[in-house]
């Protein structure tokens, strides 16, 4: 299901048999209708970014709910898919902050230790937040709690009111939080643009003696 170290750590923050409940939920959801992302990509964020390599978290709310968009990484879409509005604004801020990036697929961020996690890992087709409050929040809250226990610093990038509520789980003074309004068109001009999260993240990592992220890769 996930990278084994993630699995063992996450389980310690969940009720007994919670993984079984998740699997039952997934069986029913995928049998009853069209759900994104593809089932094999539900836990992709944890599969491609091992716990021991994670140094940044970018928290999204739930997967894109349009055809072929969601790929299991927050805000990312496959290269051949047009960038949704939030991703357009993320790339615009990146261009203003560090430089232009033409790729819509953010997998190269994930491979550098940037955990691209959504709070809900599935969504029914065409129904934003359709699986909110059903199964995922205790699981993804546990992921944040696992990161909070890390001895090495993690930069938590929290965009929007929903993500910022998760600050309650980040109590370890070794870690750093960068927060701003959400990059969606509704809120991007209220403080997301100009917030420079990418250069600020690298400045923190380098100050901590860690390698910065090549955001343009």
Curated annotation (Swiss-Prot):
The keyword Protease does not apply. CDD domains: UDG-F1-like. The keyword Isomerase does not apply. Its EC number is 3.2.2.27. It comes from the Bacteria. Its main location: cytoplasm. One of its GO terms (cellular component) is cytoplasm. Excises uracil residues from the DNA which can arise as a result of misincorporation of dUMP residues by DNA polymerase or due to deamination of cytosine. This is Uracil-DNA glycosylase. It comes from Streptococcus pyogenes serotype M4 (strain MGAS10750).
């Amino acid at each position: 299901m996930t990278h084994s170290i993630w699995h063992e750590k996450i389980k310690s923050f969940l009720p007994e048999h919670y993984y079984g409940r998740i699997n039952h939920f997934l069986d029913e959801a995928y049998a009853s209708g069209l759900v994104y992302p593809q089932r094999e990509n539900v836990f992709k964020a944890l599969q491609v970014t091992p716990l021991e390599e994670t140094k940044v978290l970018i928290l999204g709310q739930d997967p894109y709910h349009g055809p072929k968009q969601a790929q299991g990484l927050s805000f990312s879409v496959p290269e051949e898919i047009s960038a949704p509005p939030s991703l357009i604004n993320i790339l615009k801020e990146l261009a203003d902050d560090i430089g232009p990036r033409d790729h819509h697929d953010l997998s190269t961020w994930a491979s550098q230790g940037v955990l691209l996690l959504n709070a809900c890992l599935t969504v029914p087709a065409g129904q934003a937040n359709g699986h909110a409050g059903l199964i995922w929040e205790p699981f993804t809250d546990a992921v944040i709690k696992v990161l909070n226990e890390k001895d090495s610093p993690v930069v938590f990038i929290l965009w929007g009111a929903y993500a910022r509520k998760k600050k309650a789980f980040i109590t370890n003074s070794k870690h750093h939080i960068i927060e701003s309004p959400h990059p969606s068109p509704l809120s991007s001009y209220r403080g997301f643009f100009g917030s420079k999260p990418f250069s600020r993240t690298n400045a923190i990592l380098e100050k901590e003696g860690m390698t910065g992220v090549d955001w343009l890769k």
